[in-house]
Amino acid sequence: EALEWTNTWWEQAESEDLPRVLLIGDSISVGYHTAVQKELDGLYYVDRFSTSKFISDPFFRRELELYASEYTYRCIHFNHGLNGLDFPLEVYRDHYRRTLEMLLARCPRVILALSTPITEVDHPDVLSAELNPVVLARNEAVLRLAEEYRLPVNDLYEAVAGKPSIRKADGYHYTEDGAALQGKQVAQAVRKAAE
């Protein structure tokens, strides 16, 4: 990407009165973070590590390791599949596995989220013929890893598929209603996994 970014959030960084959960993702996780916070208010502090970096970028792993080691987490929600779409599936799968094993060494409760669809620019009702097959292949790889490691899956793809009214025109992102819908589903998955 021409511009790389990392956006992190520690909620009530000095407080220890509630357990913490960690959301890991790309820009989609930035969108639903506030909704997850509202849903889990009073139950968990909701921290977030979001980045544009592809999963094989060495800085991705270094930054995430540093961030994830700051606190003990009750649960981690891992949603990272919309960046670096030109990389081969094998590279994605290999580095996803490495990242997953690093996370599991810190927290046994990891939820694997399926990435959301990509639509044509200015046509939120039409799936991208070029990019959405990449998302589907990556989601299939995540499902196989979830089965192998016996981890829960949060299907954010199906949650928003076929709902053009909650999509923005850029092909990737969601309206406030779309982010709220995802946030509720993420919070539900976190509550279930963190029990």
Task: List the predicted regions and their residue ranges.
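Serine-esterase "nucleophile elbow" of acetyl-processing enzymes
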Residues: 1-72
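Alpha-helical cap/lid subdomain in secreted, periplasmic
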Residues: 38-43, 59-195
